[in-house]
């Protein structure tokens, strides 16, 4: 028995180190790139603002100095900076959720939308728009609140179905999430058809395709707490995530309560997904693609993978949002459309490269 346990330990250590690269250099590069992207996101637009003035406005606001007269302060502090920060937070959160869900169900092609949570959030948001539930405009706090309630209700339903018969098996969890998610998606489509006017329909479709245009400092509050908290929680359980990828027996041999860890992972990823979808709508491919890219750089060890996924996800969504705002003069592109157009070819390339290296 002792020999078997020692072999399990060695197997886990080897899996932790396989294909790994120290996370420090890539993380430093991503951090610098993220800072540059945030600067560009605030500086670029219909009215260009010099980068030096951008950070001058931010510094004056943070230090409590009186803002200078003019439009630059309004554009930077009230419009573009909250949006850039929201893009970074949502991108980081999607990167974390994607990494965690892929470990939860032991499937590298899984993402949080597989569990049905985003479908529930979308139904809540569409109901708020079409049926007039909740206070606030189409991109106000009423919409976000309704989306989060929908996500939590779906979480409870998927949890109840997945727990039937005892245990918390990945296959049962995925099947429950897919089935419930498809049902909610059909109901959402029905509500879209019931939209009373063209403006309502446009608001619904634009939100369903992902949008950061409703960013405000008030809207930032919840994701600003939820994303760092989730990162710290997941980082503390990184070895458990590594063990889950090697199978339940191996994880149990390492002293991990597999069922409890899966329950906790499902809860955390569901709540975080609900928060993200509530403030940004459904943004595709980020949670699926980011972990794949980061694994190519630092390997599969979640101690390195989680922080790098958060940084890369933040950078990716900030850059995508710049494209969405500036690509067309007459209107803004939905964020989810751009992530799908960029993400699908990139993911196919990465998968082809990985499968080619295996063969």
Residue ranges of predicted features:
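Alpha-helical transmembrane segments in inner-membrane proteins
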Residues: 1-359
